[in-house]
Amino acid sequence: MAENQSTVENAKEKLDRWLKDGITTPGGKLPSERELGELLGIKRMTLRQALLNLEAESKIFRKDRKGWFVTQPRFNYSPELSASFQRAAIEQGREPSWGFTEKNRTSDIPETLAPLIAVTPSTELYRITGWGALEGHKVFYHETYINPEVAPGFIEQLENHSFSAVWEKCYQKETVVKKLIFKPVRMPGDISKYLGGSAGMPAILIEKHRADQQGNIVQIDIEYWRFEAVDLIINL
């Protein structure tokens, strides 16, 4: 067993040197496992374990059916701020992109979303889902919920604008983050597919409650981030 472990460690060191030499740049795709094994003289099963160890150290990441990639620089995320993902990414010299996958109404209102109907009752909520990417690699998926009785027509106004911009321009509300919840989770299969991952991949869940000037919760965001893609920074 010790010999097997030593063999895996040796393979991991070879791969580590490959990464440090910059043969594949951040965000770039590694050769296939067969090609890597031939290039580095590593057996297939040993190579797979070494790759998994490097993934656990956030040095590489997988995309389902697309192979292994070198981890990009982590995105510095301050979730307590109202700055949009686009603006924060550009300020860090990154190339952001994003998109919506659904904009609809839902009558399924679990206890987590109860603050949205505490002041203004409603039997439905707007549900908006989407993703964000850096340099073409998707790094997070989000679900956003809003009470249509508080902000009628919000999903029609959204288009490609930020949520905070729509609140200010169309509803004259300035929103601030009032509550944050962080959880390490295994990503559900229906969500991981949007990020090119597989069911059960490790992720960081961020639940964000946004309030208006009166302190009423008007928006709840639930975000799933690839664990190797983000550093969370809270400014006190």
Swiss-Prot record:
The highest taxon in the source lineage is: Bacteria
Q: Which Pfam families match?
A: GntR (PF00392), UTRA (PF07702)
Residue intervals annotated as DNA-binding region are 33-52
Molecular-function annotations in GO? DNA binding; DNA-binding transcription factor activity
> What positions does the domain HTH gntR-type occupy?
5-73
List the keywords (alphabetical). Answer: DNA-binding, Transcription, Transcription regulation
Question: Which residues form each disulfide bond in the chain?
Answer: none
A biological-process GO annotation: negative regulation of DNA-templated transcription
Q: Which InterPro entries match?
A: Bact_HTH_transcr_reg, Chorismate_lyase_/UTRA_dom_sf, Tscrpt_reg_HTH_GntR, UTRA, WH-like_DNA-bd_sf, WH_DNA-bd_sf
CDD domains xref list? WHTH_GntR (cd07377)
Matching Gene3D superfamilies: Chorismate lyase-like, Winged helix-like DNA-binding domain superfamily/Winged helix DNA-binding domain
What is the protein name given in its UniProt record? Uncharacterized HTH-type transcriptional regulator YihL
